[in-house]
Amino acid sequence: MEMDIDLDDIENLLPNTFNKYSSSCSDKKGCKTLKSGSKSPSLTIPKLQKQLEFYFSDANLYNDSFLRKLVLKSGEQRVEIETLLMFKKIRSLLKEHYGENYLILKANNDEYIKFICECVKGSRYIRLTKDKLAIKRKKKFDNRTAEELIAFTIRIDGELPSLETIEKAVYNCRNRSSESSDVNKPNKPCKFNGIYVKSFGTNAHCIYIGFLKHRYTECFRDCFSLQQITCFDYSCSSLISLKEAGEMKRRLKKEISKFVDSSVTGINNKNISNEKEEELSQSCFLKISKIPAGSKKYQIREALDCDRPSYIQYDDKETAVIRFKNSAMRTKFLESRNGAEILIKKNCVDIAKESNSKSFVNKYYQSCLIEEIDEATAQKIIKEIKDQRSSIDEIKAELKLDNKKYKPWSKYCGRKRRPVSKRKNKAINKMSTEVKK
């Protein structure tokens, strides 16, 4: 299969390309035909090839509107070499290659076109047209935006589920967000109608799953078991060919036809309810003691570094209570620490008092202990959080705005009024800050 142009692939390609051209130019006759004024003409060839590959790469075409228009102007997606000779980077590379002869040959572009044709010959991503006057991609450029391609791909990190589990999840994926015009019904399986998997377990750290539409990614996220996954992340990755997608669909249909039970991959309501209850349980809390006097909350957050907690209770004392979103994040945080200690930066006054004989860490940082919290303190904090949430809910109920009261005033001054939702959010945030105070 022909590959898309990627910057990482181009970087990896450079040494191989250089070795190839350096061996071909080791002969004196081969170097003389290039009419080069530089000492090492073979160095310019891989540089120029790499630059041309970058111009036609997905990463550049999504950002460079001028070159994208030239590529999409013709059906072949070709760009004339004479147009590329106008680019500053190409001119500087040609000047580096030809040296003094560059000024003599500047009036005639035929010599430069021949040299660029020589550079394109060994490329994996671009090629010459039949008339050898233009360059085009080996694989056609997809005219969709980069944001769309990012939204079509899901990356699964953390504890990776098995291939079997992912296949069942894709097969049992239900189109919950289907439109009225779509053939699929809300409770009917998609049957791989526009859904395919790009790769399975090729990497030891993550799995990529590609979809043809953005709503299929959301559908897959809803139908996948929440216990099997620690992190969903949209990753920029171009789609594979439709031919390969069709083959993958047929393969998956054969492998998954034996699975009937969808309870493994569907949403488990018990797990979700337990997670919501677990958000306000004792297993989500930790206590930090021996904190330097006068420390602030942001200093504690910086010391915790990874998996920052969603809540910190600290009132300028030596102890602080931190709460994570769930127990999984708490255990992950404890596992990432070799010991039960964290380092918090001391204040300037305390640092000045310390002697110079101490090490850098002992002078500028203080080691604080991580301890378990007792049940009574946890219940007290949970009650405070619930009271705060209920007060915010009451504020939301009071701030239900009647559309009749707020008539649009664009008729009078010619400007649009802010939507009701934005006015609501602004008022809720203002009231919630007052409640916290």
UniProtKB/Swiss-Prot annotation:
Residues in xRRM domain copies: 279-397
Domain HTH La-type RNA-binding: 38-145
Keyword Transferase set for record: no
Keywords tagged on the record: Chromosome, Nucleus, RNA-binding, Telomere
Matching Pfam families: La
Keyword RNA-binding: yes
One Gene Ontology biological process: telomerase catalytic core complex assembly
Feature: compositional bias, Basic residues: 417-427
Source species, domain of life: Eukaryota
Predominant place of localization: nucleus
Region (Disordered): 417-437
Modifications after synthesis and translation: The mature form of the protein is a protein of 43 kDa, which is derived from a 51 kDa precursor by proteolytic cleavage.
Protein role: RNA-binding protein required for assembly of the holoenzyme telomerase ribonucleoprotein (RNP) complex. Specifically binds telomerase RNA and promotes its assembly with catalytic subunit p123, thereby stimulating enzymatic activity and processivity of p123. Telomerase is a ribonucleoprotein enzyme essential that copies new telomeric repeats onto chromosome ends and functions to maintain cell division.
Subunit composition and interactions: Component of the telomerase holoenzyme complex composed minimally of the catalytic subunit p123 and the telomerase RNA template component.
UniProt cross-references to PANTHER family, sorted A to Z: LA-RELATED PROTEIN 7, LUPUS LA PROTEIN-RELATED
Family, as annotated: Belongs to the LARP7 family.
Protein name stated in the entry: La-related protein 7 homolog
Species whose genome carries this gene: Euplotes aediculatus
